[in-house]
Amino acid sequence: MRLLVALDRLDGAAVARGLIAAGLPSPDVYDAADGLDATFDARLRAVFAVVAGEPRLDRDTIDGRVTGEIAVRARQAGVPCHAIVGTDRLDPFGKRILDLQHVLQARGAAQLEAAGTRLARALMTDVMPD
């Protein structure tokens, strides 16, 4: 099974390189900058986990930004949601509302790639199907 990387204004290709470098199959990369279209839910149902992300994770994420919507749809579909963000300003309760499994901070391509690698290692031990 594959992983879905759905990022808003972050470099999804860099995250994908990190995931692949750690040994995961090539992920399905979805550009969420313009919101979620009709294909998103079908793509979500075809993966074992989703990585959402945006430049800043905060209370506005819960109140309507696309990363919050990705997390809600993932929870509704029974798909674990992880986040890679530029800055994490969301309190633990907010993360629980979104049911985020991991939250990693990264800025720039090199850090995004490294975050992808760290997340892949966690996924391979936590949620990777046999």
Where are these regions (language model features)?
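N-terminal loops that bind phosphate or other acidic moieties
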Residues: M1-D130
